[in-house]
Regions:
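Residues at the starts of beta-strands that form the adenosine-phosphate
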Residues: 4, 46-48, 73, 105, ...
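A short, conserved beta-strand element in the Rossmann-like catalytic core
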Residues: 13, 114-116
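Phosphate- and divalent-cation-binding pockets in alpha/beta enzyme and binding domains
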Residues: 42, 59-60, 118, 199, ...
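Short phosphate-binding loop-to-helix
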Residues: 68-105
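Short beta-strand-to-loop acidic/aromatic patch adjacent to the donor-nucleotide binding site
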Residues: 104-114
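Conserved core of the sugar-phosphate nucleotidyltransferase
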Residues: 116-190, 194
C-alpha cells in the first residue's frame, strides 16, 4: 500500500514572529513544505495529510490548492486549541488529530523543515518495503542539523545496530558547542505503520492523567522514546545522507533561501515546482 505523508503545520510560530509554514523561500512563493511534498511524490507517497489550525485554514488551503493540491489528493485535519491553553498540545497530539485520515503506513514531517531528497527517499523505501513496515526515524548528524547562527533544541538519539535505544532533548545547542561528530539527532521525520496510533493514544491518555500544565506538550520524540525504551528493536534509524535546513527564527530565512537556490542551480529541483 502506498504511504501517506502527514505534515505538521499547526505550529504557532511565536519565536519566528509569524506563520513560518507559509514563509516564501523559493521562486514563485514556494515554501518549505512544497519541497518536502515534491520529494515525497517522487518517492512513492500518494496522498498528503496536513494538520493545521482553524485560524490558518484559509491561508494554507489557498497556498496548497494553487500548488501541490493540483497534483495530489490532500486531506486536512485540525489540531484544536483548548480554551485553557495559548498553544497546541504538541506534535504527538497533532498526529492523533489526523488519525481518521491515516489508513495505512505513513510518514510524519514538519512543515517548516527541509529534509533533503535522500531523507524522504529513504523513508519512502522503508514504508514500501513491507505491508507492515514497523517504525523508523531519519537520523541526521548533529553538524548537519544546526542553523548557521543561534542556539536551538535538538533531540539526540542513541543508536545501536541501527536501532533507536533512547532519545533525549538537548537545549541551547549551537555550532559553537562541543559534540561528537557521530552524534545523531531526530528532526521529526518519522515513519509508522497504522498500529502506532494505538500506542500513541494510550500514551496520550497517560499524559493527561498527569494533569499537564498550560505549557506542557505531548511531543512525538518523547512519546516514541518511551515506547522504544520499553520495547527493544522497535524503531529503525535511517541515515539522512543530506543536510537539514529550517525556519526556527527570522535569521534563518537567508540561509534557507541560499540553500534552495543552490539546489535549484544544481538541477535538484525545477525553478517552478508545480508548473
Amino acid at each position: 500500500m502506498p504511504a501517506r505523508l502527514l505534515i505538521l503545520a499547526a505550529g504557532m510560530g511565536h519565536r519566528f514572529g509569524g506563520l513560518k509554514q507559509l514563509e516564501a523561500v523559493g521562486p514563485g512563493g514556494t515554501v518549505l513544505m512544497d519541497y518536502t511534498v515534491f520529494d515525497a511524490l517522487r518517492s512513492g507517497f500518494d496522498r498528503i495529510v496536513l494538520v493545521i489550525r482553524r485560524e490558518t485554514e484559509d491561508a494554507i488551503h489557498s497556498h496548497v490548492e494553487s500548488g501541490f493540491g493540483r497534483r495530489v489528493h490532500v486531506d486536512y485535519a485540525f489540531q484544536e486549541l483548548d480554551v485553557s491553553r495559548s498553544k497546541p498540545w504538541g506534535t504527538a497530539q497533532a498526529v492523533l488529530a489526523a488519525r481518521d485520515a491515516l489508513d495505512g503506513p505513513f510518514a510524519v514531517a514538519n512543515a517548516d523543515d527541509y529534509y533533503g531528497a535522500p531523507a524522504i527517499e529513504a523513508m519512502g523505501r522503508f514504508l514500501s518495503s513491507d505491508p507492515d513496515p514497523g517504525w523508523a526515524m531519519v537520523g541526521y548528524r548533529m553538524v548537519d542539523a544546526l542553523p548557521v547562527d543561534g542556539a536551538v533544541s535538538r533531540a539526540r538519539v542513541r543508536v545501536e545496530d541501527g536501532w533507536m535505544r533512547s532519545i533525549e532533548e538537548l537545549h541551547g545547542v549551537s555550532r559553537e558547542c562541543d559534540f561528537d561528530a557521530g552524534t545523531q539527532v531526530s528532526m521529526n521525520l518519522w515513519g509508522f505503520d497504522r498500529d502506532f496510533l494505538r500506542h500513541l493514544e494510550r500514551g496520550w491518555q497517560e499524559f493527561l492523567k498527569g494533569e499537564p500544565g498550560a505549557d506542557d506538550e505531548y511531543a512525538l520524540p518523547v512519546a516514541v522514546g518511551a515506547i522504544a525504551a520499553a520495547t527493544p528493536n522497535r524503531v529503525r534509524v535511517l541515515a539522512a545522507q543530506s543536510r537539514w535546513c529550517g525556519m526556527t527564527s527570522p535569521a534563518d530565512r537567508e540561509d534557507v533561501r541560499r540553500t534552495l537556490t543552490e539546489l535549484i542551480s544544481q538541477g535538484r529541483y525545477p525553478e517552478r515546482l508545480w508548473e
